[in-house]
Amino acid sequence: MVVDKNASGLRMKVDGKWLYLSEELVKKHPGGAVIEQYRNSDATHIFHAFHEGSSQAYKQLDLLKKHGEHDEFLEKQLEKRLDKVDINVSAYDVSVAQEKKMVESFEKLRQKLHDDGLMKANETYFLFKAISTLSIMAFAFYLQYLGWYITSACLLALAWQQFGWLTHEFCHQQPTKNRPLNDTISLFFGNFLQGFSRDWWKDKHNTHHAATNVIDHDGDIDLAPLFAFIPGDLCKYKASFEKAILKIVPYQHLYFTAMLPMLRFSWTGQSVQWVFKENQMEYKVYQRNAFWEQATIVGHWAWVFYQLFLLPTWPLRVAYFIISQMGGGLLIAHVVTFNHNSVDKYPANSRILNNFAALQILTTRNMTPSPFIDWLWGGLNYQIEHHLFPTMPRCNLNACMKYVKEWCKENNLPYLVDDYFDGYAMNLQQLKNMAEHIQAKAA
């Protein structure tokens, strides 16, 4: 097959072959828009990382490979990409020869983890996690019935955090190899119990995994107008209210911590907006899911407001709502802002996108593990391991750590791990770097 390089669609490299995906096929992608992140790039390891256990995905890949070809022009374009260093922006300086060795070595590591059983689903573990998390929520409701209202609100905040981790794992297809079952359970835990849209989360989070800390790709580092991580963010302040906010951004490292409890308000708000636009989205998967996405989000807010209605006074209702919502926000935010915000970013056209393992390792910081942190953080203290192998069950991440540390040592890559306060200080330092840059420009 001769591919028209001017045709609409998408080109990406998988397992050494350049594949062409028509526009129609792209729009049918079950994962939605995340596929666009690897346009004209090597998607080999991101494909294997995301599609572990999916016979449908590998069947489609085999069909595309039959028409795959070597593309000298795109190969040269991959090798020509150069990074510019800036404030909080690093350069990917691994040579093409080193990169090829690294990619081959990582494939061997992935296969070894398979052989050692670390990628195997553990249904019993996740059944226990589901029951224990449901029990936390049930106990919160029971305490409300007994009149322990503030304690109940705090416990509900904890339940929402833990459901966040559990939903995250079902969305990554960790608990079982039955993808429709995982997706259905994540709809119940995520949308109905937690209030976060599953499809909104997948779109946002899978893109973050595919291009971690890559500018103009990873939405998790685009926090303008409240925060600016890189000089390029300053171009985004165009509207009048954004220009007004820019006046306080030089103090962003001072108010960042106070904003953490607001995360749940932000995510539930974005979820509501997403589900009621889902019918009109261009990707077929979102159109198909729209009704159940909407019904479960409406169901979530129905039980939340009914629960508040059962409280005896309006001051208690307001207090319960604020404590549970902001407590849940803080418990999630102190985790999700630790692992990547404290590490440098990479330019939009960086060649690092062709080296999946290096991308994840150079843009991720682990939190020092302990049994309590493993539970409270939902295994996301092993963020490096999780980003390298997103379908690996949480209960195997600790065992995976020694393999990854050894691989990093062999390939001269840093393995970043710090306690919470050191890592959080580095997060604030990134914000302060930009704050000082803005102050210097204004002087």
From Swiss-Prot:
<dbReference type="GO" id="GO:0006629">
    <property type="term" value="P:lipid metabolic process"/>
</dbReference>
<feature type="domain" description="Cytochrome b5 heme-binding">
    <location>
        <begin position="1"/>
        <end position="71"/>
    </location>
</feature>
<dbReference type="GO" id="GO:0001820">
    <property type="term" value="P:serotonin secretion"/>
</dbReference>
<feature type="transmembrane region" description="Helical">
    <location>
        <begin position="296"/>
        <end position="316"/>
    </location>
</feature>
<keyword id="KW-0812">Transmembrane</keyword>
<dbReference type="Pfam" id="PF00487">
    <property type="entry name" value="FA_desaturase"/>
</dbReference>
<dbReference type="GO" id="GO:0035264">
    <property type="term" value="P:multicellular organism growth"/>
</dbReference>
<dbReference type="GO" id="GO:0043050">
    <property type="term" value="P:nematode pharyngeal pumping"/>
</dbReference>
<dbReference type="GO" id="GO:0014055">
    <property type="term" value="P:acetylcholine secretion, neurotransmission"/>
</dbReference>
<dbReference type="GO" id="GO:0040011">
    <property type="term" value="P:locomotion"/>
</dbReference>
<dbReference type="GO" id="GO:0016020">
    <property type="term" value="C:membrane"/>
</dbReference>
<dbReference type="InterPro" id="IPR012171">
    <property type="entry name" value="Fatty_acid_desaturase"/>
</dbReference>
<keyword id="KW-0444">Lipid biosynthesis</keyword>
<keyword id="KW-0472">Membrane</keyword>
<dbReference type="GO" id="GO:0006936">
    <property type="term" value="P:muscle contraction"/>
</dbReference>
<dbReference type="InterPro" id="IPR005804">
    <property type="entry name" value="FA_desaturase_dom"/>
</dbReference>
<dbReference type="InterPro" id="IPR036400">
    <property type="entry name" value="Cyt_B5-like_heme/steroid_sf"/>
</dbReference>
<dbReference type="GO" id="GO:0032456">
    <property type="term" value="P:endocytic recycling"/>
</dbReference>
<keyword id="KW-0560">Oxidoreductase</keyword>
<dbReference type="GO" id="GO:0030421">
    <property type="term" value="P:defecation"/>
</dbReference>
<keyword id="KW-0443">Lipid metabolism</keyword>
<dbReference type="GO" id="GO:0016717">
    <property type="term" value="F:oxidoreductase activity, acting on paired donors, with oxidation of a pair of donors resulting in the reduction of molecular oxygen to two molecules of water"/>
</dbReference>
<keyword id="KW-0275">Fatty acid biosynthesis</keyword>
<feature type="transmembrane region" description="Helical">
    <location>
        <begin position="136"/>
        <end position="156"/>
    </location>
</feature>
<comment type="function">
    <text>Can function as a Delta(6) fatty acid desaturase. Introduces a double bond in the fatty acid chain 6 carbons away from carboxy terminal to biosynthesize polyunsaturated fatty acids (PUFAs) endogenously (PUFAs are essential for membrane structure and many cellular and physiological processes).</text>
</comment>
<keyword id="KW-0276">Fatty acid metabolism</keyword>
<protein>
    <recommendedName>
        <fullName>Delta(6)-fatty-acid desaturase fat-3</fullName>
        <ecNumber>1.14.19.3</ecNumber>
    </recommendedName>
</protein>
<dbReference type="GO" id="GO:0018991">
    <property type="term" value="P:egg-laying behavior"/>
</dbReference>
<dbReference type="GO" id="GO:0006636">
    <property type="term" value="P:unsaturated fatty acid biosynthetic process"/>
</dbReference>
<dbReference type="GO" id="GO:0008104">
    <property type="term" value="P:protein localization"/>
</dbReference>
<dbReference type="GO" id="GO:0004768">
    <property type="term" value="F:stearoyl-CoA 9-desaturase activity"/>
</dbReference>
<dbReference type="GO" id="GO:0045088">
    <property type="term" value="P:regulation of innate immune response"/>
</dbReference>
<comment type="pathway">
    <text>Lipid metabolism; polyunsaturated fatty acid biosynthesis.</text>
</comment>
<dbReference type="GO" id="GO:0098793">
    <property type="term" value="C:presynapse"/>
</dbReference>
<dbReference type="GO" id="GO:0016213">
    <property type="term" value="F:acyl-CoA 6-desaturase activity"/>
</dbReference>
<comment type="similarity">
    <text>Belongs to the fatty acid desaturase type 1 family.</text>
</comment>
<feature type="transmembrane region" description="Helical">
    <location>
        <begin position="318"/>
        <end position="338"/>
    </location>
</feature>
<keyword id="KW-1133">Transmembrane helix</keyword>
<dbReference type="GO" id="GO:0040002">
    <property type="term" value="P:collagen and cuticulin-based cuticle development"/>
</dbReference>
